């Protein structure tokens, strides 16, 4: 969880 919503 550090780019879009992963």
UniProtKB/Swiss-Prot annotation:
Domain of life: Eukaryota
Organism lineage string: Eukaryota, Metazoa, Spiralia, Lophotrochozoa, Platyhelminthes
Primary localisation category: secreted
Chain segments annotated as transmembrane: none
Keyword Secreted: yes
Modified residues (Phenylalanine amide): 6
Keyword tags: Amidation, Neuropeptide, Secreted
Protein name: FMRFamide-like neuropeptide GNFFRF-amide
Keyword Secreted: yes
